[in-house]
Each structure stands twice: as structure tokens, then as C-alpha cells.
Swiss-Prot record:
It catalyses: an acyl-CoA + a 1,2-diacyl-sn-glycerol = a triacyl-sn-glycerol + CoA. This is Diacylglycerol O-acyltransferase 1A. One of its GO terms (cellular component) is endoplasmic reticulum membrane. Keywords: Acyltransferase, Endoplasmic reticulum, Glycerol metabolism, Lipid biosynthesis, Lipid metabolism, Membrane, Transferase, Transmembrane, Transmembrane helix. One of its GO terms (molecular function) is diacylglycerol O-acyltransferase activity. Pathway: Glycerolipid metabolism; triacylglycerol biosynthesis. The lineage of its organism: Eukaryota, Viridiplantae, Streptophyta, Embryophyta, Tracheophyta. It is an enzyme of class 2 (transferase). A motif (FYXDWWN motif) lies at residues 369-375. InterPro entries: Diacylglycerol_acylTrfase1, MBOAT_fam, Oat_ACAT_DAG_ARE. The gene is DGAT1A. Residues 1-67 are annotated as: Disordered. It comes from Glycine max (Soybean). Coiled coil: none annotated. One of its GO terms (biological process) is triglyceride biosynthetic process.
Length: 498
């Protein structure tokens, strides 16, 4: 027997009864005897009385429908009618739980989450008061961070230099090896120049992080710009030699070095260069205003959680590698929830709000800045889905070029994580002036987790196992531990300087 998920209701039973005793078209509203008699009378009547017949039928419809419903109800759920007809499972049993809709439970979780966090916020304010201060983000030194600001503005020099090199290469004024060397010099200078400025200036943490993020974005864009133009020159030479290009390239633009294309690429929410992008027809001003309001609100929420919850927790903690183990575990677990809230707010503010705002202003069409990484079954799925601009850059300019040069997939994956770890370390360690390789080690630790979660996924064929491991390692253990490590090292450094 087939197991049905639909519960049998009274309406279903009524329907079954009506199906078993469905009247014919001629006897829909009358009994069989009445139908036989009336049919004989109708043959004797004049055919010109159609209007009177239709009027009588219209008047008798409510009464006839009521009689039919009563007839159906008369035989519905009688004691002799079986109440159990099919083999059925309970809605929460293991065989049917994932085929049920849990929208009501999801709403309940939201209500409970709002209620519990509202109580915690009120309790925190009553116990500790208003703790928000700007000193951690913008101190008196922030006004003296003008070298970092000037360095940020001067980063546009490097794309302009790359454009000059590409223009010379297009006109065949310099050979290809010289083009490659010049691009290596330009991209390296665009990254090391901000690092030197930050290390020489004792700037605020947020100012240093902002400059390093800008520098990393410029470096990634310059690499994509140089690599894409190099590949387009190679394809152009192949066409000139008469070689046929495969249709899978999908290149709908010619090789042309344009400063307008470079300028648009520098401000567009993408890290992969191409001479033209899909564009939307117009700017939605109302939608843009709503996203700006959301950005302001969620940025404020993120700052509130950091100052009101995370800072007091880390200030009242010990170094996780030097104190009591149980105490360190308690601090990490206590820090995990507000840290997760901040990370989710950061993701929503940057990847959803800010990048979409920038795309709307520039009419940038491809807005797949992330995928459903929260459903990641493995650690590899998470890194492939949560940051699509970086992921597309990695597979376009690093991973597949490694495969084309005969490097095994495992080694290419290791190289991709190595590059990611280096940039994570630069963005955190340089502004903190601390080089303990905590961020680097945290990213490289993902490599064995990739193979472990892939093995578990293939062994158990259960998405829940990998997803829970991902959430535990990522939000409960990894990030809070890194926050505590960098905070205490930063405080120790400030104490030594003072």
C-alpha cells in the first residue's frame, strides 16, 4: 500500500460519499422516479417553453443543492463507514518529517528569538548601562590618519599604470615578457605600498582594515585586468593564424583596451574584468532608498552588538591559550552567539545591501554576489557559495589555470586556500601590527575540513551531518577563538607600547 501524507478530513469523506453516489447529468437534482415521470411529460410539452423551463430550473437550484448536500451528509461518517482507510505516518516521524512544511515552527522560532534577545538586551542595559564608545573604532589618532587616507586615494595610480602597459602591448610597442614583468611590478607595488604605510603609522584599527581591504580589492582587479587582456591577446593571435575558437568561449566582445572599460571595472561590484557587462535598463530610486535605510539600520545593530556585548566579553576574558581550559571554553561559547550575529549582519550589509546598492547605481546586471551558503553540506560548498566575486576570481585566474598547467586538483585547491589565507592574514594582522598567523592558520585549517566533510557526505549521504559540522566549526569554535586571540595580542601590544 502507498503511504499518503494527506490527512483525511470530513470534507474528504464527504467527497468520497459524493463520488460513490454521483448522480447522472439527467438526475442531478431529482430522484430517478421523478426524472422518469418528468421526461415523459417533457416530450408532450411544446418546445417553445424554454424560457419558463430555465426560470423554474434557476429557482429550484438552491433547494436541489440543499437536498443533495443532505443526501451526502446522510451517509458521511456513519458508524459502519471505515475511519481508517490507508497506511499513514505521523507528521514528525523520520519518514515524513522532511516532506512536511515547517513554516509555523519557523515563525515560532522567530518569535522566540525576538523575545529572548529582547530580554537579554534589556537585562544587559539594566546591568551594565550604555557601553557604546567610539574609542575602539575612532580614537584621537583617527584624525591623524591622513597618510592612510592619502594612500587610499593614490591607489588609482596603479590601475592607470596598468592601462598604459596594456595600451603599449596592444600597439605591440613592448614584447609580451616585458608586459608580464611590468604587471608583476605594478600589482606587487599596489599591495606592498599600503602595507608599508600602515606599519609606519600607528593608526586606528578600522582605518587600517579599510585601507587593506581597498588594497586587496585593487590587487585582485589588477591581476584580473592583466590576465584577461593577456588571454584575449593570445586568442586574437590564434584567430590571426587561422585557428578556430570553440563556441564555449562565449566571447561577445573584441579585444580592445579602453580606459572607459577599466574605469567602470574599478568601481563595479566584481573582481573579474571583461570589456562589457550585462546592464539593467534604469536605476530604481525607491528601491535604492530602501536599501540605504536598511544599510544604516543594520550597521547600527552591528555596532551595538560589538560595543555592548563582544567588547565586554573579550575584556573580561583571559588569553585562550594561557588560562584555564574550562574557562576558555566558557568564554568561547559565550562569545559565539554575539559574534555570529555580527558576522551575519556584516554579510547582509556588505554582500546583499552594499554590493546591490553599488550595482544599482552602476546598473550592473549580474548580482549573484552569494548563493545559499547557509545550506552548505560541506566546507568546500561554503567557500564556493558565500563569496561569489572572490570565488569567480579564484576559479578564473587561479584554480583552472593551475589545472591547465597539469597541477592536480588537490594541489590546486591547496594553492587557492593558501592565497586566501595570505590575504586574510594581511587584512587582519597588518592593521593590528601583530603577525602571529592566527588568521592564516584558521584558513589553512579549512583544507583538512574540506576532505573530512566531503568524506562524511559521501559516506552517510546526509546533508545534515556536513551542515552541522560546518556551523559548529565556523560559528561556535573558529571565529570566537580568532577574536579572543587577536584581541589579547592587540591589548598586550598596546600595553607594551604604553
Amino acid at each position: 500500500m502507498a503511504i499518503s501524507d494527506e490527512p483525511e478530513t470530513v470534507a474528504t469523506a464527504l467527497n468520497h460519499s459524493s463520488l460513490r453516489r454521483r448522480p447522472t447529468a439527467a438526475g442531478l437534482f431529482n430522484s430517478p422516479e421523478t426524472t422518469t415521470d418528468s421526461s415523459g411529460d417533457d416530450l408532450a410539452k411544446d418546445s417553445g417553453s424554454d424560457d419558463s423551463i430555465s426560470s423554474d430550473a434557476a429557482n429550484s437550484q438552491p433547494q436541489q443543492k440543499q437536498d443533495t448536500d443532505f443526501s451526502v451528509l446522510k451517509f458521511a461518517y456513519r458508524p459502519s463507514v471505515p475511519a481508517h482507510r490507508k497506511v499513514k505516518e505521523s507528521p514528525l516521524s523520520s519518514d515524513t518529517i522532511f516532506r512536511q512544511s515547517h513554516a509555523g515552527l519557523f515563525n515560532l522560532c522567530i518569535v522566540v528569538l525576538v523575545a529572548v534577545n529582547s530580554r537579554l538586551i534589556i537585562e544587559n542595559l539594566m546591568k551594565y548601562g550604555w557601553l557604546i564608545k567610539s574609542g575602539f573604532w575612532f580614537s584621537s589618532k583617527s584624525l591623524r590618519d591622513w597618510p592612510l587616507f592619502m594612500c587610499c586615494l593614490s591607489l588609482v595610480v596603479f590601475p592607470f599604470a596598468a592601462f598604459i602597459v596594456e595600451k603599449l602591448a596592444q600597439q605591440k610597442c613592448i614584447p609580451e615578457p616585458v608586459v608580464v614583468v611590468l604587471h608583476i611590478i605594478i600589482t606587487s607595488a599596489s599591495l606592498f605600498y599600503p602595507v608599508l604605510v600602515i606599519l609606519r603609522c600607528d593608526s586606528a584599527f578600522l582605518s587600517g582594515v579599510t585601507l587593506m581591504l581597498f588594497a586587496c580589492v585593487v590587487w585582485l582587479k589588477l591581476v584580473s585586468y592583466a590576465h584577461t587582456n593577456y588571454d584575449m591577446r593570445a586568442l586574437t593571435k590564434s584567430v590571426e593564424k587561422g585557428e578556430a575558437l570553440p563556441d564555449t568561449l562565449n566571447m561577445d566582445y573584441p579585444y580592445n583596451v579602453s580606459f572607459k572599460s577599466l574605469a567602470y571595472f574599478l568601481v563595479a561590484p566584481t573582481l573579474c574584468y571583461q570589456p562589457s557587462y550585462p546592464r539593467t535598463p534604469y536605476i530604481r530610486k525607491g528601491w535604492l532608498f530602501r536599501q540605504l535605510v536598511k544599510l544604516i539600520i543594520f550597521t547600527g545593530v552591528m555596532g551595538f552588538i560589538i560595543e555592548q556585548y563582544i567588547n565586554p566579553i573579550v575584556q573580561n576574558s583571559q588569553h585562550p591559550l594561557k588560562g584555564n581550559l574550562l574557562y576558555a571554553i566558557e568564554r568561547v561559547l559565550k562569545l559565539s552567539v554575539p559574534n555570529l550575529y555580527v558576522w551575519l549582519c556584516m554579510f547582509y550589509c556588505f554582500f546583499h545591501l552594499w554590493l546591490n546598492i553599488l550595482a544599482e547605481l552602476l546598473r550592473f546586471g549580474d548580482r549573484e554576489f552569494y548563493q545559499d551558503w547557509w545550506n552548505a553540506k560541506t566546507v568546500e560548498d561554503y567557500w564556493r557559495m558565500w563569496n561569489m566575486p572572490v570565488h569567480k576570481w579564484m576559479i578564473r585566474h587561479l584554480y583552472f589555470p593551475c589545472l591547465r598547467h597539469g597541477i592536480p586538483k588537490a594541489v590546486a585547491l591547496l594553492i587557492a586556500f593558501l592565497v586566501s589565507a595570505l590575504f586574510h592574514e594581511l587584512c587582519i594582522a597588518v592593521p593590528c601590527h601583530i603577525f602571529k598567523l592566527w588568521a592564516f592558520g584558521g584558513i589553512m585549517f579549512q583544507v583538512p575540513l574540506v576532505f573530512i566533510t566531503n568524506y562524511l557526505q559521501n559516506k552517510f549521504r546526509n546533508s545534515m551531518v556536513g551542515n552541522m559540522i560546518f556551523w559548529f566549526i565556523f560559528s561556535i569554535l573558529g571565529q570566537p577563538m580568532c577574536v579572543l586571540l587577536y584581541y589579547h595580542d592587540l591589548m598586550n601590544r598596546k600595553g607594551k607600547l604604553d
